Amino acid sequence: MGAPRVVAKGMGEVARRIRELGAENGVPLLEAPPLARALHRHVELDQEIPGTLYAAVAEALAWVYQLTTWKKSGGQYPVPPQDLPVPAELVPEVVNG
């Protein structure tokens, strides 16, 4: 088994549709713009994530695992991770306008 792979990506309307399909299918949504931007910029579809993003993706996947456990067992809702460790050089600048 290799590293996690990017299975969908997009910007604007495509990203909105991905989120919409996820919601319709019960897929948890984690808001992590720096990680999303780094993955979008540096990883192609069906490509494994680079080692430099392992820690950030591992934290996100750990939260998903906690959600799965919570759904089965109840208890306190898992706190989504904040400030995922995404190397600054991988996060593209956001240009408005």
Q: Which sequence ranges carry the predicted segments?
A:
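Divalent-cation
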Residues: M1-G97
